[in-house]
Amino acid sequence: MKKVFGLSFALSFLITLSAFAQPPGVNKGAVEAFNKGVSEANKRNFKEAISFYSKAIELDPKHANALHNRGIIYYNMRSQPEAVADFTALIGINPKDHDAYNERGLAYADQKKFAEAIADYTKAIELNPSYTAAYNHRGNSAFAMKNYTDAIIDYTKAIELDPADANLFNNRAKTFKAMGKDKEAEDDLAKGKRLAK
C-alpha cells in the first residue's frame, strides 16, 4: 500500500527558530545548533543535520523541534529504531502531539510492528478525530495484518474527510480486491483514476 506520509519531505522540519528575541531561559547554543541543523537539512546534508540536531538535544534535552526533525530524518534514512526513540521522547515532552504518535506509528509499521503502529494511529485519531493521514495509515497497517474489514472502515473514514484524495480510493480498492469484492474494487479504482487526472 502506498503511504501518504506527512513527513515525506515536504521537509516538514523547516521549522526555524530565530536566535533573536528568544524568551528568557532558552539555551542559545541549542537554538544555534538547531538552526544549523535546519540549514543542513535544507541542503539535504542529512548526516550533518542529525549531528546539529543531536547537539541541540544534548544542550536542551526537551528541544521538541530538534527531536521531531531528527526523528523525521531517521525515518527517511530507514533508521527506524532511532526514529521511534525520538518520537517517543517527543511524546514524553508533549503527550498530546498527535503528529508524534502518527510518525512513530509509521516507524513501527516500517519495522512490521503493526500492532504498535495501530495503537499509535489510534492515539493520534483520539487526539485529532479529523486526522485523515492517521486513518489512512491505520488502514494500511490493518491491511498488512489482513484485517480487511478494519482497513475498509479506516479508508472509508479517510475518504469522508478527504474525498479528493485518489490514493485513499486506491487503497480501499486494493482492500476490496483482497476481500473478493471486485465490483467495489472496480468502482473505487475508477474514482481514484478520475481524481488523479
Region locations from a protein language model:
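Alpha-helical tetratricopeptide repeat
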Residues: 2-197
